[in-house]
Structure formats: structure tokens, C-alpha cells
Curated annotation (Swiss-Prot):
Pfam family, one: S-AdoMet_synt_C
Region of interest called Flexible loop, as start-end residue ranges on this chain: 100-110
UniProt name for this protein: S-adenosylmethionine synthase
Binding sites annotated in the UniProt record for L-methionine: 57, 100, 251, 282
A GO CC term assigned to this protein in UniProt: cytoplasm
Residue numbers binding Mg(2+): 18
Protein's gene: metK
Function field: Catalyzes the formation of S-adenosylmethionine (AdoMet) from methionine and ATP. The overall synthetic reaction is composed of two sequential steps, AdoMet formation and the subsequent tripolyphosphate hydrolysis which occurs prior to release of AdoMet from the enzyme.
Classification via PANTHER family: S-ADENOSYLMETHIONINE SYNTHETASE
Annotated residues for binding of ATP: 16, 175-177, 242-243, 251, 257-258, 274, 278
Subunit and partners: Homotetramer; dimer of dimers.
Family, per entry: Belongs to the AdoMet synthase family.
Record's subcellular location: Cytoplasm
Any one GO BP annotation for this protein: S-adenosylmethionine biosynthetic process
Amino acid sequence: MSERKLFTSESVSEGHPDKIADQISDAILDAILAKDPEAHVAAETAVYTGSVHVFGEISTNAYVDINRVVRDTIAEIGYTNTEYGFSAETVGVHPSLVEQSPDIAQGVNEALEVRGNADQDPLDLIGAGDQGLMFGFAVDETEELMPLPIALSHKLVRRLAELRKSGEISYLRPDAKSQVTVEYDENDRPVRVDTVVISTQHDPEVTNEQIHQDVIDKVIKEVIPSSYLDDKTKFFINPTGRFVIGGPQGDSGLTGRKIIVDTYGGYSRHGGGAFSGKDATKVDRSASYAARYIAKNIVAADLAKKAEVQLAYAIGVAQPVSVRIDTFGTGTVAESQLEKAARQIFDLRPAGIIQMLDLKRPIYRQTSAYGHMGRTDIDLPWERLDKVDALKEAVK
């Protein structure tokens, strides 16, 4: 009998407390970048019942009304009713932002490669904002070259938000979570969905039976292709039996606590650094995007069925200290060839990544819910497939 395996990933909605924090941090980043593209930003957010704290380090000459940005973001998510215990107009907003450390700034603003050498390449000027390792990944399981479990998990909670905001399911509230377990065959190909878990916040009057039926009919069956569902697929809808108290009233939230949701759902490794609230000189963010860009173009070029790219940096140094590509035995060329090609085709210095992906723009708020990778609903530069031909040519 052939061996089959299960793999599970989860996602959370824009109304989840940690995601509220991520969206506020990225909304602040975007507001600053819109006025000052050269700004350095590290904005952290904590949310809980009736209160938002924004703290961190910023270097900019621009003025941004933090209070207004916070309230507008909360309102856009859907927290506009005081019954939710967290409302855009009544929440207390407490900003505490200071200037970036000059010790860090000197390494970012003048990389090791250019110190004492005025003739260096200007793209060597910016050093990495910190040491660290970052991963990017792609696999040919979906059209967007993402693992199927996380792709479906994101689509489920996004569908819930659409139904809530349109009023089609009027009893839905903003907080929600999804989890999808996919069965893989002996060739590591997805063959069916084994389990779907959805927990969604709701008004107190609605029955569990109504929620169960609506979620199956209007969410699950609208999102998951019927070819993946069968009579053995298990559905757990609000398995606690009640989810009225949610959002920051039910649980505190912090920026950067959903890094696996933000990336590949645990299917690929993660370097540990969060994204939201950070400008592109922070390689936690920009190099993760670059690594995804490389991996996606490798798979799209049919040079591997799956590819994981690791980049690593030293603080204040422009060039990465290592580039590693793993194709898990699915590659059509040697991994060393792919690593050499990646270094040739993709400029992996922080300033090179920023230029290559045009990262000084206010594009980050839209990434802060429903995943930073594999998005088909928005145009993100690291999702483009414009390096396929160059990669094919480089490994001939």
C-alpha cells in the first residue's frame, strides 16, 4: 500500500489581534514612506481591550498623524462597533516612537564595503540593518507556486472577510482563523483535503447550525476545489461552540507574532524575523522578499519542482555572507549552478534589493493580512516572473 502523508497550515483574518497589530505597523510605515521614501522605520504595535500602543524607532523628517492612521486602519478592518470591545473611534492610542540608534544607523547608511573608499559602487552604500538569515520558497502545487495548505487557508479567511464586509453574512464579526490539512501521495503531490477547521467570530443571536451551514456552503465549497473534497473530509466549524468575544477584547495582539502565516505555513523553513512595520533596509523583510523572488522564478523556469533559498547577512555589510539553494531532489540542474546564477541575476545587497523590487514605496499595508507571498489579488514585485528566461540562459 502506498504511503500517504498529511500536512497542515493555518491562517488568520485581518481582524485577528496579531494581524491588527501588523496592519497598524505597516499602515504607519506606508504613511511615512509616502512622505519620506528614505525614512528608516521599525514600528511595533500592541493591541488589547480598548487600547493600542505604538512604539519603536523611526528616522524621518516627515510628520504623520499616528493617531489618525491607527484609527483609520482599525475602521477599515471592521472594528466600528463598541459592542466588539474594541472600536476605531473609542480606542485609546498611545504612541511612543523614538529616533533610530545612531550606532545602527551608521552601519546602514555607510556599509563596510564603502568606508574609506569613495569610488565604490553606490549600491554598496547601504549595509544590512541587522545580521540574520532569511528564507524564500516556491513549489508547483498551485498556480501561484505556493504550498496548497497555506494557499487554501488564506483564501478561506479572505472569503469570510468578503462575506462580512459585503453584508452577505451579516452576523460575522472581524476575528477568524482557518486551518487546512492536505493529504499527499507517495510522490509528494497533494491529492485531497483531509480536514478543514474554521473559527469565526459572530453575533450572539445566530445559531451554531446556521454558522456551520453558511461556512460550508458559502466559504469552504466556494474556495476549495471539489476535486480535493470527498465524503471523508472532516469539517470543524467553531468547534468550541461559541465565538462572540474576539479580537483584542478576547486576546492581546502584537506585531510579528504570525510569521508562519505570513510566509509558507510551516512548509518551508523560516529565519525568525518578522516583516510588518519595517522599512526595506531591514533585511528580515527585504531579503525574504528577494529569496521568494528567486525561488519562484526557479520553479517557474522548470529548473525545479520546489526550491528553498536561504540568504544571510552581517549587520553593516552589503553583500550577503551566504546564498544557499535547496531543490529537495527535484532540480534539473545542480544546486551550485542555481546559486551561481542567482548571484549573477539578482542583486542581493540591501540597496540592490530595494532598487530591484522598488521597495521605497508605500506598498506594505496590503501585505499585512492574508500572506506576503503568493498573492494573486495584488501586484507585488517579488511575485513577478520576469527572471525566468535569464535563469534558463544562465544554467545552460
